[in-house]
Amino acid sequence: MAMVKRINNLPTVKLAKQALPLLANPKLVNKAIDVVPLVVQGGRKLSKAAKRLLGAYGGNISYTEGAKPGAISAPVAISRRVAGMKPRFVRSEGSVKIVHREFIASVLPSSDLTVNNGDVNIGKYRVNPSNNALFTWLQGQAQLYDMYRFTRLRITYIPTTGSTSTGRVSLLWDRDSQDPLPIDRAAISSYAHSADSAPWAENVLVVPCDNTWRYMNDTNAVDRKLVDFGQFLFATYSGAGSTAHGDLYVEYAVEFKDPQPIAGMVCMFDRLVSLSEVGSTIKGVNYIADRDVITTGGNIGVNINIPGTYLVTIVLNATSIGPLTFTGNSKLVGNSLNLTSSGASALTFTLNSTGVPNSSDSSFSVGTVVALTRVRMTITRCSPETAYLA
């Protein structure tokens, strides 16, 4: 039988329902329907039993096409409470298992298709415990071991915007961490593992784990598929405004084995400017990539798009340099030190980055650089207390 729903919970409704079995005159039933409008959901016709109950009169009955299975209603005042989670350690013979949840990034709205908040680096969110961009806390544990495997992994989107926000938020997982980023919505719809929702709706992407042991991040690896468990991507489109849609969290259960000497939390960067904008030597933790360092136009700009506090030392082989500025997603902590001698300048400072990419300004920049030939830089993750420069 098609489901019949009365619109208004009026006293006349209850009275009519109680009187229907007792009424002998169909005309009185029809009169009751005149004051009790009905809506049939699902767009289906009434069954014979329903017609016999309601009589021949049907002028006050309307048919509406209801929401299809899986549809989500826009909430009016519903929010999610996100409590802190203590990491759980489970020890077994030869390995240790960690269960935890971490914050990844805030999702920014965009009218056109934008992937990873506009960060164009391939493999930014590589699924590897040593990847600081995806596992801010876990990276400190991962550097103590040589191999890992995920037994549970899922990405959760928690909205912070209202139900009037427009657009879509897509969560994606690509098994190949070296695949290029999707450039259109057709590419997004082709992913085997994806989840798409409105910006005001919660969303979860469950990643299928294969129970395979892999090596930690190795900067010398030719094929990253041997060390990475794919890559995570997120995309937004058809949105408006500048307020973040929501936050992304990663929930995981990961096992480590084969302890090794501590790998460190330092990134080393070296570029001969006379060669090109790419092809630089980068070792250690992937706080930055080639594209994040701009050395053209007489200025140097560096983008650190991973949240955290960092101690930075940059050495510039140049005749002279201009001031150090922070106009992007970072701010200076304390003061900076500057030393110039024999055609080279060294700057040391501490910065705090929000991790949200800024398409207009770099995290920090050095202006008016004359006759630049080489850029060397070390970036160390730290805390303001241990890296503060008075």
From Swiss-Prot:
Similarity comment text for this entry: Belongs to the icosahedral plant coat protein family.
Record-given protein name: Capsid protein
PROSITE patterns to which the protein is assigned, alphabetical: ICOSAH_VIR_COAT_S
Keyword tags: Calcium, Capsid protein, RNA-binding, T=3 icosahedral capsid protein, Virion
Source superkingdom: Viruses
Entry cofactors: Ca(2+)
Primary localization: virion
Organism for this UniProt entry: Melon necrotic spot virus (MNSV)
Subunit relationships: Homodimer. Homomultimer.
GO MF terms, alphabetically ordered: RNA binding; structural molecule activity
Cofactor note: Binds 4 Ca(2+) ions per icosahedral asymmetric unit, itself composed of three capsid protein subunits. Ca(2+) ions probably promote virus assembly and stabilize the virus particle.
Gene Ontology CC: one annotated term: T=3 icosahedral viral capsid
Location(s), subcellular: Virion
